Design a protein with these regions (language model features):
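Interfacial/capping segments of alpha-helical transmembrane domains
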Residues: 81-106
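Generic detector of multi-pass transmembrane helix bundles and their immediately adjacent loops
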Residues: 137-288
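Cytosolic juxtamembrane amphipathic/interface segments immediately preceding
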Residues: 41, 45-62, 111, 115, ...
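Short aromatic-rich membrane-water interface segments that cap or initiate transmembrane helices
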Residues: 103-123, 174-183
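Individual transmembrane alpha-helix segments
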Residues: 116-145
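Soluble N-terminal domains of membrane-associated systems
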Residues: 1-48
């Protein structure tokens, strides 16, 4: 509401006929500023507030950018499948000879994780966080770097999925991915959305200076990126200790589905009460 009112103020200022409205909106924003930016919790309470309130709120405010990341990833995956179907050499080029040979033998390459669970889990966490940060950072190039990262990640997933399905390992692959992928993939999409949000700030500043536009978009984007770090840590633990085990396939899918539902509820519902309280407070101020 605060950001929308600020945008309305910018529009009103650009129209000389809306001078009275501009003054009213400016006064309203001045009173609302303290409610929005003053008195935020700090320390441990601040961290708790961020993850229980602010992060899901920012996700809902910027969900279109995450949706764009999902679409780019899906397009990359579809392209990966299409190119693998039409050109077997492409499949070998992307995955490499050793991995193709392993898949052709109907062997999963993931079982080696079991022997080194703690080390593997740590490496997975580090890699996933690094990939998410790189995907986000690509947004500074007007979103081009983020676009490339999301498309290439999707393409790789598409090629792997096709290769495994071709060799009868589709169920093995998806049952491996399900437990941790339910958190890891949404985290990647949110990081991609953060990158696109950053790119929007660079390319489309509107009436703001490019510096101010990037600053505003960057704050929101960083919040999105920081919010997925714990999700990636949890996903790394699951990928190292649960996904590669011999746990029954239905249980793996159940774990994945349960985690995804919990994540969706968290992102869609958490922080709504405090947001409603702020809106009520702002409305009361504007009427006084």
């Amino acid at each position: 509401m605060y950001r929308q009112t600020a945008a309305d103020l910018s529009t009103a200022r650009a129209d000389p006929r809306s001078a009275t409205l501009a003054r009213y909106l400016n006064e309203l924003l001045g009173r609302a500023h303290n409610h929005v930016y003053i008195g935020a919790p700090t320390g441990a309470r601040g961290i708790l507030y961020f993850f229980t309130q602010r992060f899901p709120q920012v996700f809902r405010e910027t969900w279109r950018y995450t949706a764009a990341a999902v679409l780019v990833f899906a397009a990359g995956a579809a392209l990966g499948v299409l190119l693998s179907v039409t050109d077997p050499a492409f499949e070998r080029f992307i995955l490499g000879v050793d991995m193709i040979d392993t898949i052709d033998k109907r062997e999963m390459w993931t079982h080696s994780i079991v022997a080194v669970k703690p080390l593997a889990s740590s490496g997975i966490m580090t890699n996933n966080i690094a990939v998410s940060f790189a995907t986000f950072a690509g947004g500074i190039l007007g979103g081009v770097g983020t676009l490339y990262a999301m498309a290439m990640n999707g393409l790789l997933i598409g090629v792997v999925a096709f290769s495994c399905a071709r060799s009868g390992l589709g169920l093995s692959l998806f049952s491996f991915v399900a437990p941790h992928g339910s958190l890891e993939l949404p985290s990647l999409f949110i990081a991609g959305g953060a990158g696109f949000l950053l790119g929007r700030g660079v390319l489309f500043p509107g009436r703001l200076s490019r510096r101010d536009s990037l600053l505003i978009a960057g704050r929101q984007a960083v919040r999105l990126l920081l919010g997925v770090v714990p999700l990636l840590v949890i996903a790394g633990i699951i990928e190292g200790f649960v996904s590669p085990t011999d746990l029954a396939v239905p249980f793996k899918f159940l774990i994945g589905a349960s985690l995804f539902v919990l994540l969706a509820l968290y992102l869609l519902a958490a922080g709504r009460r405090s947001g409603a309280t702020l809106a009520t407070s702002l409305t009361t101020d504007s009427e006084s």
